[in-house]
């Protein structure tokens, strides 16, 4: 049984970790921390978890207690894992970070986008980017895993087959992405209020979003060189979900794109390439650790449109974190993650 600690258990990704791990056959949450809610039973804060964590209460983060775990998840704002990860790694504890603290390999670039100096640049060499569909073998031997963001997960998985095959114009990629309001987190945010977000639809951060350098970093690796990406995120009035509409130019019209995508993801348990002509919906992945993809070539032209949907809290965060844990400890990659999407 893998002994699990969670730092930051009161946000959406933290409670989603609890929900998924409650049904995991080979993992047990033994520590969960929250400075603001220390002493409160988990089941009191989250009644949906009654009967699963009745003996577990939030506690103040303590390195000695966390260091006794096999793995610690950080479901915290950026900067928190910088302060604690080094001590936990020194204690022999594996670290899986759901924040952005170790996603970017360049600490200067990280500081530019997150508005503060990188707090643990010495750990970046140890950090493995936790996109299993790309880095599965590195994840197996990792000490520190950086779980990808939600937009980067949907966007990279959609573009990867085209870039790896070298058939796209890498200088003119477009990612037109939509997210539900849970992507903004559980804290007070005027733009996420029901009366502000409901019956409305808007773009934001067009000048530059924090996920842009992460997406660019991953696509460069896939392409083996520089890429040009325009990334425009939007907020839509739903709770969960990411829908990425991706555009790339592919001059060779003889390429069987459906076959290309099906072959690339044939052995991936959490990527579903839908039949030709499909239009995946966010509701089909709600609550599931699945990225559902469809590829189109409208009017048989040279513009390719890829549709990629995920649940931002599952495959875009906590589910992918558990998937990484399964790989890291040699477990069945599907363990605790077999849930179908919730419909309606």
From Swiss-Prot:
PROSITE patterns named among the record's database cross-references: ARGC (PS01224)
Alphabetized UniProt keyword annotations: Amino-acid biosynthesis, Arginine biosynthesis, Cytoplasm, NADP, Oxidoreductase
A biological process term (GO) from this entry: L-arginine biosynthetic process
Catalytic activity field: N-acetyl-L-glutamate 5-semialdehyde + phosphate + NADP(+) = N-acetyl-L-glutamyl 5-phosphate + NADPH + H(+)
Catalytic residues (UniProt): 150
Pathway the protein acts in: Amino-acid biosynthesis; L-arginine biosynthesis; N(2)-acetyl-L-ornithine from L-glutamate: step 3/4
Cellular-component GO terms for this entry: cytoplasm
EC number: 1.2.1.38
GO MF, one annotated term: NAD binding
UniProt cross-references to SUPFAM superfamilies, sorted A to Z: Glyceraldehyde-3-phosphate dehydrogenase-like, C-terminal domain (SSF55347), NAD(P)-binding Rossmann-fold domains (SSF51735)
Chief location of this protein within or outside the cell: cytoplasm
Localization, UniProt: Cytoplasm
Protein family membership: Belongs to the NAGSA dehydrogenase family. Type 1 subfamily.
Primary role: Catalyzes the NADPH-dependent reduction of N-acetyl-5-glutamyl phosphate to yield N-acetyl-L-glutamate 5-semialdehyde.
Name of the molecule in the record: N-acetyl-gamma-glutamyl-phosphate reductase
Species annotation: Pseudomonas syringae pv. syringae (strain B728a)
Gene symbol of the encoding locus: argC
